[in-house]
């Protein structure tokens, strides 16, 4: 029996010896569970692309390679652990031909834990939650620690955004508030973690995000861009680094989301005041980032009663989702079920929020979005227009984000994870109750050009004792019509038809002006002609099958 020279000691060929040593180490460490060869080769190649900073290949490996291998090999089990991967790719000390793999291992673990979160039906264990957060801490430590020169690392935009997004989202707060998700053994561990604040905690999260802003000088650079200046003039080597610029940029949106989840809507908008709703923005390169940005900015405006501004932002986002629907469906199929369909879920939420905004402040929107809105929520909008507070509650709960209470820890008893949502919902409904008659009030005002306040009060069955509060509600409607204090995010000089009604009160008389914008009939026909031409063009491209003579 002749033995292959490769199956034994050294051959004298450095490349074959290195391959043998790597394979030998991998098999020794994975005696209980052999890593498939495809996975081992994928990891080795992935690390090499990280070392070479080949962003195009990294993007392909991240977006397609990892989900594909997950679908093939890891439906019922987890990816190899850290030690196994180190032995596959080489740890630096054991295999001298490979550079130190610390950064790659951290990045691999980021994918590993994301897979853990999607695969475990009852949620990850406390140990996994702890290790996942510590891994993010290590990653940002590598980014923020250098003082003289930036970290030598390049990653695709979508991965950088996912890192920030997952870091902000970490559902540890929901886990802490729900004793039903914990085993009895995890009680003591959670107590220790909370005392040391060594898992997801709002203060270090905010500290890291603001540190990324400072390190990248992103606010100064965005301000320079808006003013037409060269951003490099206000940035140092870190700010000019693509890695730091993008992390800082996405951290702004991460902070926006964090402040919204905490219920601080003014600070949320203040955080992104230098980010414009611009089709050339960096967030446009990552669809889920674009949708997240629009959703949270629009939601903040809605909670601050800027319903007209919120409507415009929601409609723009829905139009984007509508235009890219086929592309997103294709991407989601390629990713299998590894990554959550953020865009699909947000699309549904946007319609519920848009229904609230248009009920409180009607305005003309895109025809295609309006038809979809009435199809989905038409009956609900009718109920809300008639003052049904329960429909407002349901629409809010179906459209709002998962609010956080970072300090809440429940060691035993009922699930308290929904308490933050209920607090925000109740605060929102208090505002709505003060405006609940506004849609009805608007209906009466549209029937007149002048109307005494007493007569309007009698129409709405307002008693003399409640007359003063009724006048207050009238002034509230006036404020909504004018959108006092509105801060427009896009700062674009466009035709802004926010409402079709305006009025003022002169002593005891209401003077109403119908400001309805005339429908652009010519524009409508032009759009329909373009659609007809497109249909004709497609029909002409179809092959013509000759009729078969009988």
UniProtKB/Swiss-Prot annotation:
HAMAP family assigned to the protein according to its UniProt record, in alphabetical order: eIF3l
Localization of this protein: Cytoplasm
InterPro entries attached to this UniProt entry: eIF3l (IPR019382), PCI_dom (IPR000717)
Transmembrane portions of the chain: none
Function: Component of the eukaryotic translation initiation factor 3 (eIF-3) complex, which is involved in protein synthesis of a specialized repertoire of mRNAs and, together with other initiation factors, stimulates binding of mRNA and methionyl-tRNAi to the 40S ribosome. The eIF-3 complex specifically targets and initiates translation of a subset of mRNAs involved in cell proliferation.
GO cellular-component term (any): eukaryotic translation initiation factor 3 complex
An example molecular function term from Gene Ontology annotations: translation initiation factor activity
Family indicated by similarity: Belongs to the eIF-3 subunit L family.
Entry keywords, A to Z: Cytoplasm, Initiation factor, Protein biosynthesis
Protein's UniProt keywords contain Cytoplasm: yes
GO terms for biological process, alphabetical: formation of cytoplasmic translation initiation complex
Region Disordered: start-end pairs: 1-20
Subunit-level organization: Component of the eukaryotic translation initiation factor 3 (eIF-3) complex.
PROSITE patterns: PCI
Name assigned to this protein: Eukaryotic translation initiation factor 3 subunit L
Covalent S-S links between cysteines: none
Record has Flavoprotein as a keyword: no
Native source organism of the sequence: Brugia malayi (Filarial nematode worm)
Residue span(s) of domain PCI: 309-503
């Amino acid at each position: 029996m002749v033995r292959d020279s490769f199956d034994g000691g050294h051959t004298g060929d450095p490349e074959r010896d290195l391959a043998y040593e790597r394979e030998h180490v991998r098999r020794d460490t994975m005696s209980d569970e052999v890593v498939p060869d495809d996975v081992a080769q994928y990891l080795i190649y992935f690390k090499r692309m990280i070392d070479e900073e080949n962003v195009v290949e990294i993007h392909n490996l991240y977006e397609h390679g990892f989900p594909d291998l997950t679908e093939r090999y890891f439906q019922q089990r987890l990816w190899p652990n850290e030690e196994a991967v180190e032995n596959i790719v080489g740890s630096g000390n054991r295999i001298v031909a490979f550079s130190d793999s610390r950064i790659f291992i951290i990045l691999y673990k980021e994918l590993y834990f994301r897979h853990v979160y999607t695969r475990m039906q009852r949620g990850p264990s406390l140990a996994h939650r702890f290790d996942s957060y510590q891994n993010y801490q290590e990653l940002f430590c590598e980014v923020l620690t250098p003082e003289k020169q930036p970290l030598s690392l390049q990653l695709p935009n979508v991965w950088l955004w996912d890192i920030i997004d997952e870091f902000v989202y970490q559902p540890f707060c929901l886990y802490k508030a729900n004793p039903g998700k914990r085993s009895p053994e995890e009680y003591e561990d959670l107590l220790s973690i909370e005392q040391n604040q060594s898992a997801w905690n709002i203060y270090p999260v905010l500290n890291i995000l603001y540190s990324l802003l400072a390190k990248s000088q992103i606010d100064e650079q965005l301000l320079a861009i808006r003013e037409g200046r060269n951003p490099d003039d206000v940035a140092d080597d870190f700010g000019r680094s693509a890695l730091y610029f993008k992390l800082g940029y996405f951290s702004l949106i991460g902070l926006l989301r964090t402040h919204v989840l905490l219920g601080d809507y003014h600070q949320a908008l203040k955080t992104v005041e230098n980010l414009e709703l611009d089709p050339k923005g960096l967030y446009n390169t990552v669809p889920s980032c674009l949708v997240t940005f629009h959703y949270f900015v629009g939601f903040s405006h809605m909670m601050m009663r800027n319903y007209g501004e919120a409507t415009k932002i929601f409609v723009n986002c829905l139009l984007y989702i509508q235009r890219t629907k086929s592309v997103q469906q294709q991407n989601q199929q390629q990713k299998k079920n590894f990554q959550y369909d953020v865009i699909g879920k947000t699309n549904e939420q946007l319609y519920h929020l848009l229904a609230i905004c248009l009920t409180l402040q009607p305005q003309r929107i895109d025809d295609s979005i309006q038809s979809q809105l009435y199809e989905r929520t038409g009956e609900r909008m009718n109920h809300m227009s008639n003052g049904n507070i329960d429909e407002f509650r349901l629409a809010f709960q179906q459209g709002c984000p998962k609010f956080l209470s970072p300090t809440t820890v429940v060691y035993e008893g009922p699930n308290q994870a929904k308490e933050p949502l209920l607090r925000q919902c109740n605060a929102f409904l208090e505002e709505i109750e003060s405006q609940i008659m506004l849609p009805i009030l608007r209906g009466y005002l549209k029937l007149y050009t002048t109307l005494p306040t007493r007569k309007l009060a009698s129409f709405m069955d307002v008693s003399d004792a409640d007359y003063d509060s009724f006048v207050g509600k009238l002034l509230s409607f006036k404020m909504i019509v004018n959108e006092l204090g509105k801060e427009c995010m896009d700062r674009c000089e466009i035709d802004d038809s926010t409402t079709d009604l305006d009025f003022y009160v002169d002593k005891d008389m209401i003077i109403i002006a119908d400001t309805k914008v005339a429908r652009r009939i010519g524009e409508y026909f032009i759009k329909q002609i373009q659609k007809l031409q497109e249909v004709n063009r497609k029909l002409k491209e179809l092959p013509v099958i000759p009729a078969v003579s009988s």
